[in-house]
């Protein structure tokens, strides 16, 4: 199915008349570690950094008149454990922010403003019991933060 494709390969399948495109990704890239994290100079989808460039440039080219917004991953309980490529989740967050800044794409930094940090025991218990996926209450918090932040953009 087309939605099984990597994010970078989905651009061709998106609605050509979209007014706003919001991309929320990075945590599965970290967790699965399928591609090396790469360097900022990478421009092909073989690395996470290159895939960010490839995706952002592709969206800008397809949607020059639309608003594009990227969202950083949320914190996760295992964020201080390196992935299979030896990288921490925060490195993926920083790549998204740096690459979006390069393209002048706004970033909704959920890493910094979501209020969901499962490394804090009470937050994990109430909003993110598995340490990764927000529960219904966690999604309510996310929705409120996302709505407030999107209104600022």
Regions found by a protein language model. Give the residues of each.
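Surface-exposed amphipathic alpha-helices with a cationic face
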Residues: 56-63
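Conserved SGNH/GDSL esterase-like catalytic core that processes O-acyl groups on lipids
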Residues: 1-53
């Amino acid at each position: 199915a087309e939605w099984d494709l990597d994010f970078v390969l989905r651009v061709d399948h998106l609605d050509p008349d979209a007014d706003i495109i919001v991309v929320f990704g990075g945590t599965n890239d970290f967790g699965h570690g399928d591609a090396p994290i790469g360097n900022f100079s990478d421009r092909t989808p073989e690395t996470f950094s290159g895939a960010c460039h490839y995706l952002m440039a592709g969206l800008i080219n397809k949607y020059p008149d639309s608003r594009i917004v990227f969202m950083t991953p949320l914190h996760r309980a295992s964020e201080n454990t390196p992935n299979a490529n030896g990288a921490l989740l925060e490195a993926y967050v920083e790549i998204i922010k740096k690459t979006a800044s390069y393209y002048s794409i706004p970033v909704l930094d959920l890493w910094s403003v979501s209020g969901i940090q499962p490394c804090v025991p009470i937050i994990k218990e109430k909003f993110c019991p598995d340490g990764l996926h927000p529960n219904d209450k966690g999604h309510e918090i996310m929705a409120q933060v996302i709505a407030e932040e999107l209104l600022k953009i």
